[in-house]
Amino acid sequence: EIDGRKGTPASCTTPCSPGMTVSTQTPKLERLRRGVMELYISDHPLDCLTCAANGDCELQDMSGAVGLRDVRYGYEGDNHLSLGKDTSNPYFTFDSSKCIVCNRCVRACEEIQGTFALTIEGRGFGSRVAAGFNGNFFDSPCVSCGACVQACPTATLTENTVIELGQPRRTVLTTCAYCGVGCSFKAEMQGETVVRMTPYKNGGANEGHSCVKGRFAWGYANHQDRQLEPMIRESITDEWKKVSFEEAIAFAAGRLQDIQTRHGKYSIGAITSSRCTNEEVFVVQKMVRAAFGNNNVDTCARVCHSPTGFGLSNAFGTSAGTQDFKSVEYADVILLIGANPTDAHPVFASRMKKRLREGAKLIIVDPRKIDLVKTAHIEASGFLQLKPGTNVAVINSLAHVIVTEGLANTAFITERCEPTEYAIWSEFVSRHENSQEAMEAHTGVPAAQVREAARLFATGGNGAIYYGLGVTEHSQGSTMVMGMANLAMATGNLGRDGVGVNPLRGQNNVQGSCDMGSFPHELPGYRHVSDDATRTMFEQLWGTV
């Protein structure tokens, strides 16, 4: 109840305002809530003891909270109790007979995920949640992010693993093992068995959202083929045999020593994974350098990260992106280059789509016509469909427009950049060979589109650049990264929320694995092995002098 207003508005849809006086516990509200719950229960299966959501059902909890002890209405007449289940989705079940049409799932799909796969069809008592055009979940636009399942207060939307295994009994906080977004999850367990993965609401990267990979693609954790004990074999033709960790370590160490004795200290190396933790990667590179005595260590991130590491460190002094993921919520113009976040980084894509629905502009530079060119309630302001391999030509032609039309942020350049270096760069990009007209034949992008995109990025407010493997996994990757950094500096789009140059990593710890010294030419912290002082410091720290 709100003083000065009629009725009893819902708290979840009523904005706060200055001076508002709100009462949440009054006899009138208690009677109203009890009556509403009674009506819900009158059209709801009372199979709580055998329901998959027993003990984890908000309808059950609220019935007890409002003191509902009896239901005056029977099941006579029309009801929804005989509605069937939709089991088409491989990860969760939709039981329409338990739906209270609260609309939470619809709002989650629209406001959080941004897919708009769900709607309420029908009117009045006949209202029901529908996926797609009155079809099932599998045939609808649903991307199985799990937002609807998490939002559901009853057993209407339930994970199949919970139906099969029951409710989890303990929780472990963890990080998703897939893409570079780094979503935080609660692994909900029964003993050592994972029952479900629930996105952690306080996760800095995902803020309680998830994608199909992190939410449901964790079957490997429980799979019978997962090895939980060390095994060894004398030769490739022998059968594997399980042994203790002590025996396995001694066996591996002996074989490695034997190889070095016979073939020299450079005969052994290691490749780290960007799916490993910082601690694991650090120990591997330290073992290679301190124990094996060489720098034969590398990482799978070399393919996707090296151009970013080299380009951004040359431009800004650090190999990391300039912003966190929350920064996109303050962007006014988003320049998306060589990335398809709806497929590769879905949780970040949802945050980006939310900002775009709020009015931010989007410029896409990609050979492919990705989803974000035009999707539900979103249409890119510019789509520069370049020919593969012409990334640098496009970024230079964008810079040409900005410099020659006087759109550069001269105050930012004077205060924060190197004016001498800017003069050299601006003279280069101002040349006719870098103009949008000269580049059109090479890039395939019409000059008018380049001009319009450049003007929008330079004058549209906070401009943020996001890029993916379409930029870095390329022979011109480092040059392109530096080109984007130059564009950000020239327009003053650095040093605050909503701007920056931001790589979208391919795996969950690309940045960390490189920070830990996984490259043969760099020690932890990107300190070069050719520097005498750096080598001396690590030799003393690791006791290898």
Region roles according to the model:
Residues 45, 163-545:
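Catalytic alpha/large subunits of respiratory electron-transfer oxidoreductases
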Residues 1-2, 138, 317, 395:
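Short basic, glycine-rich beta-strand/loop surfaces that mediate nucleic-acid
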Residues 2-144, 149-175, 190-193, 228:
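Fe-S ferredoxin-like electron-transfer domains
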